[in-house]
């Protein structure tokens, strides 16, 4: 079964700080607990200490559309015994600028790499 993957709590807080305001079904409370709306809504309210919880792809699409940042995630190492990728790295384009291997380490999953790359963009490029 395919499931959705969401940004981490730390990344959600950074997204709010950088102006992310897209409607999301899920959100984080200030203590990291997860809440769910009955309908889509922007949960980055200034009056309530909640943080919208977008999917990784939604956050990456927002970075592309609003900040012209394209994240590229690639396999870095291959486990020939188990016949699968064993780590991933991320690079990105921002306009004509290319940043190679922006994540400080290899991550074991595509999703962890995506979250780290989004966080890097929010902390260093926006």
Model-derived features: where do they sit?
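GGW-centered surface loops in extracellular recognition modules
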Residues: 1-3, 7, 13, 17
């Amino acid at each position: 079964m395919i499931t959705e993957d969401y940004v981490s709590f730390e990344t959600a807080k950074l997204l709010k700080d950088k102006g992310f305001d897209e409607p999301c079904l899920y959100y984080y409370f200030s203590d990291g607990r997860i809440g769910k709306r009955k309908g889509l809504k922007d949960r980055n309210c200034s009056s309530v200490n909640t943080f919208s919880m977008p999917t990784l792809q939604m956050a990456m699409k927002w970075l592309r559309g609003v900040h012209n940042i394209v994240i590229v995630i690639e396999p870095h190492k291959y486990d020939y015994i188990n016949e699968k990728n064993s780590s991933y790295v991320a690079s990105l384009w921002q306009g004509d600028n290319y940043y190679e291997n922006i994540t400080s380490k290899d991550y074991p999953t595509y999703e962890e790499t995506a979250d780290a790359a989004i966080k890097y963009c929010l902390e260093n490029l926006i």
